[in-house]
Amino acid sequence: MSKVKKNDETLSEVLVDVNRVTKVVKGGRRFAFSAYVVVGDKAGRVGAGHGKAKEVNEARGKAKQAAKKRMMKVPLYQNRTIHHDVVGKSGAAKVILRRAKAGTGIIAGGSMRAIFDSLGVHDIVAKSIGSTNVYAMISATFDALNKLASPKSIAMRRDKKVNEIFVKSSDIQVNE
């Protein structure tokens, strides 16, 4: 299996978080910078990475490399929203992602917006519950995105055709 070469020119990069971190040693304190970056191709692929170095630019570069290594493909509905509602969790953070009609826009708080911009989603409603820590929220968002499945992949798993997956409202029987 060969690795697919990722074109750097087509990837968008968003710096989500930068922190100054300190390591206490015998002779005093050593300062460094920690960066968290989200990269995506705005066409259904996105990744996030963390980097640490003595300079901000070096930390950002390391974070971008880590994000490119962790890129994942997300199935999108009409290249603008997700196929179905989904919940993701990471520690005390919980996010709810809901599909939205065309023209709704990205209704999301904090670092989730950077993920959806890089992913190429135009219409989505996202709500974060619990922890608002940047790392936990991004991890919970990626957990939710991992749970997404397209109708085609669901049909393949069930050995059915795509049109057999969807239930028409006229076919639903109500027991009275």
UniProtKB/Swiss-Prot annotation:
Domain S5 DRBM per the UniProt entry, residue ranges: 11-74
Gene Ontology BP annotations: translation
Top-rank taxon: Bacteria
Keyword annotations from UniProtKB, A to Z: Ribonucleoprotein, Ribosomal protein, RNA-binding, rRNA-binding
Stored InterPro entries: Ribosomal_Su5_D2-typ_SF (IPR020568), Ribosomal_uS5 (IPR000851), Ribosomal_uS5_bac-type (IPR005712), Ribosomal_uS5_C (IPR005324), Ribosomal_uS5_N (IPR013810), Ribosomal_uS5_N_CS (IPR018192), Ribsml_uS5_D2-typ_fold_subgr (IPR014721)
GO molecular function: rRNA binding; structural constituent of ribosome
Keyword Ribonucleoprotein in record: yes
A Gene Ontology term for the protein's cellular component: small ribosomal subunit
Gene3D superfamilies per record: 3.30.160.20, 3.30.230.10
PANTHER family xref list: MITOCHONDRIAL RIBOSOMAL PROTEIN S5
Record remark: domains: The N-terminal domain interacts with the head of the 30S subunit; the C-terminal domain interacts with the body and contacts protein S4. The interaction surface between S4 and S5 is involved in control of translational fidelity.
Family to which this protein belongs: Belongs to the universal ribosomal protein uS5 family.
NCBIfam families for the chain: rpsE_bact
Assembly mode: Part of the 30S ribosomal subunit. Contacts proteins S4 and S8.
Cited function: With S4 and S12 plays an important role in translational accuracy.
Protein name: Small ribosomal subunit protein uS5
